[in-house]
């Protein structure tokens, strides 16, 4: 379970970090256009 949890957290961060970055970029461009 420990290795599974560690891998799950690593995968989650690997997916969430770029996703949040893209969301922030998208919101930033929307605000600039409006």
Swiss-Prot record:
UniProt xrefs under InterPro entries: PSII_PsbM, PSII_PsbM_sf
Domain of life: Bacteria
One Gene Ontology CC term in the entry: photosystem II
Transmembrane segment boundaries: 7-27
One GO BP annotation of this record: photosynthesis, light reaction
Keywords (A to Z) from UniProt: Membrane, Photosynthesis, Photosystem II, Reaction center, Thylakoid, Transmembrane, Transmembrane helix
Family stated for the protein in its record: Belongs to the PsbM family.
Function recorded in the entry: One of the components of the core complex of photosystem II (PSII). PSII is a light-driven water:plastoquinone oxidoreductase that uses light energy to abstract electrons from H(2)O, generating O(2) and a proton gradient subsequently used for ATP formation. It consists of a core antenna complex that captures photons, and an electron transfer chain that converts photonic excitation into a charge separation. This subunit is found at the monomer-monomer interface.
HAMAP family listed in its UniProt record: PSII_PsbM (MF_00438)
Designated name of the protein: Photosystem II reaction center protein M
Name of the coding gene: psbM
């Amino acid at each position: 379970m420990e290795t599974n949890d560690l891998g799950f957290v690593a995968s989650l961060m690997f997916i969430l970090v770029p996703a949040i970055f893209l969301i922030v970029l998208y919101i930033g461009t929307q605000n600039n256009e409006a």
